[in-house]
Amino acid sequence: MSYLRASRTSSNLSLAKKPSKTRKKLQARKEWDSSVNDLTVFRATNEELEHRREIHRSKNQWLARWELQNKANYKQSEKENSTQFENSRLALMKEILSDQYLMNDVLERSDRALAVVKDLFGDAPRRHTGFPNVTMAPSCDLETSRAPIVRKKDPPTQLSILSESVMDSQAINEVDKSLSRSEYSDSEAEVSISIQPNMKAERVQQLLTGEGPKSEAFITPHKSEGDPSQTQCALNATTAVNRVKVRRTEEESPKPEESDSIIGRVLNPHGKANKRISLKGKKKRTTNQSQTKDFSTFKASERDLTTSNQSSLGLLNSMIMEVEQDLAEYERQTGREVLSAPPAHGLTGFTLSLVSSLKRVVSYLKESDLLLQREVRERQNLQGELVEQRLMLDALTAEILSLKEGGNIHENHSQTKQCPEVDGDKLTSITQEAKTFPGLNGETCRTSADCGLSKVNQFMDSQDVQDTDEKHSRLGVSKDEFGARLYPQGRPAEEPRLASALPSHVFQQAVLLSPPRQKTVGNLSSHSAVPKRAANRLPSPPADLMTAPVEIEWPESKLFQRSINYKNTAALIERGTMVPGQENSKHVYSSAQGSERVNQHPTESTKEVQGLEIGESQINPLQNEDLVSQMQQLALQNAALKAQLEQIHFSPEGNAPEEAAAEQLHNPEPATDTPARAALVPVSLEMRIAELNRQSAEARNKLLKLIEQQKQSIVVSPTLSPITPQGRRTGSSLDTTPLSSCSTSGRRSSGASNKSESISTSVGSLRSASTGRRSQAANDRGEGWFALSAHIS
């Protein structure tokens, strides 16, 4: 296709129609506007402009402004947060990568230190690499031929020796030069071969391991460093080769030493601070010094280093040996197995010994800590058990003391149960003496147990006067009548009046002014043996009096009157035993009568108790001495009556001579009225005998009642002793001691115990007069214990 337009022919042009021309219509001209020159008419006013602004103002203007403000604030906060986040991120990265940074710093410092330490002693040989250009023979076999260049090993330096001593423990002791040379030549020979680049690594290895050491014996040179151009140059040492060698030497950087030399320098830092010099100056100095050194100076420096190193290691070894000896001694003391460590040589052996010793010490510390904890636990357990055992011991001690106290009380009560049953004839003189002391009739016992014990003790100790009373009752002559015969001047009659003139509170119950002393069982048992003998020696009363019922009157209390049949009672007393049935019946009857009396006269017994308490606080020691003298005189009178009555014998045929003699003794007057008096003497004697028998029976009955009441009080409610085993009466024991049974039995026998109290008091006075225990009474008064025995002894 062609882009050339074909020319039109003339024929075509002629045939074409010519376009017709259209005329434009002429527009009418507008009129001229003269206002064009003054356009201010069309200027908008301020109101129109404001209206236009209001019309075209956006409806979201405030929202858009708020969004823009928020965007600005967000960008600002984002910028602040980004800075904070960046700081925290950097801190975190530093914390994470700090170890790596520190490691890099340590490595850099170690590299710098190694660069300085490389030639610390200034005796390291300088190696200069040769560049051989050798034309090999055509028939040369590389496997059988020697290497073209064999670099001998460097002479030993101080640093290399130190490294070998660290790596090999036997190197320190090898000082011999020949051994050291052979050691270096055999074990640590370094062969440096410089061959052509096309030699294979296998061939080089074969040369190093096979033929090289066998064929060549390396000899340590006498000088540590020679002229590099003469000693270690290439075979074809041309000028170009020397220039290349010098350039490469300058370009080489200092290579670090081997690992063994580094370890040796770190472990033996002697002289490091004094010999640290820059690498340049050290190289220059060593170059100048090494040219003038000979082999002898090298040997001396080597020997000094060996001795100094050996001395430091020897010190460490000696110290570790001392530690091991201490550990062995400790093991022997504690009974453990002694572990003998092999002898350590060199620094490696020292480290091994140190680690093993530390391990043993740590194990022993752990074991001792465990033992200490176990001992602490055992001690705590033992302390708890000790507290429990102490509590148990305290409880057992309290129980034993209470049982002992109860046993003492029970034994005292059992002793009181064995009170002897005294015959009436024995009590005749006691009754007469009791009549002379009217102050004793109205008193009552505070507790039945105390009354019973005091009566039993007084009867037991009055055995020395019972013979006189026995003879008086057998003869039928009263002591008053017989005393009038012996003392016609009236002296014996005045002494009973003196006794009766004494106040009634003298013979009342004892007052406790200080803690009493507890008597032992032996004292009670010694006293209890006397009434048994006395009961066997008591004579029986007359048979005519035993069958006659007697009316007993109680003038002291005026509480009751009772008729007692003395036949059965005297028979029982004479046998010394009582039928169980009768004993129980008497026991019940007496207790019933005692309760009946208490119900009938409650105020009278209360008055008596109040009088007793008032009288106990008015005891005078001077009256005690008067009473003692009076009791002694009564004892003498009884002895005289006994001697006189033994001479009088009554018979139905001839009573006149004996009666006349008795009358003359009684009244020594002229014998004008002798026949009339002879007829009156038998009658008066019989009346007196009957009266004495009646009184003895009355006293016997009262004693039996007292014994029954004592048994009843023991059976019903045994009292608790207010006296502690140490012999001290505490205030709590005085307040809390139960006395219900004692007070009850005392109220039951308020009337019956008055007479018995007077009898027991008189018997106790006779006993004290016969024995004469003034020292015991003085001790009792000194201690504040004013018992009845203290008043009459």
UniProtKB/Swiss-Prot annotation:
Residues 18-27 have a biased composition (Basic residues). Residues 1-29, 519-542, 718-783 are annotated as: Disordered. Residues 718-739, 754-778 have a biased composition (Polar residues). The keyword Cell division applies. Residues 312-405, 622-712 form a coiled coil. Regulator required for centriole duplication. This is Spindle and centriole-associated protein 1. GO terms for cellular component: centriole; centrosome; cytoplasm; spindle. Residues 740-753 have a biased composition (Low complexity). PANTHER family: SPINDLE AND CENTRIOLE ASSOCIATED PROTEIN 1 SPICE1, SPINDLE AND CENTRIOLE-ASSOCIATED PROTEIN 1. Keywords: Cell cycle, Cell division, Coiled coil, Cytoplasm, Cytoskeleton, Mitosis. The gene is spice1. InterPro entries: SPICE1 (IPR031387). The keyword Cell division applies. It comes from Xenopus laevis. GO terms for biological process: cell division; metaphase chromosome alignment; mitotic spindle assembly; regulation of centriole replication. It is found in: Cytoplasm, Cytoskeleton, Microtubule organizing center, Centrosome, Centriole; Cytoplasm, Cytoskeleton, Spindle.
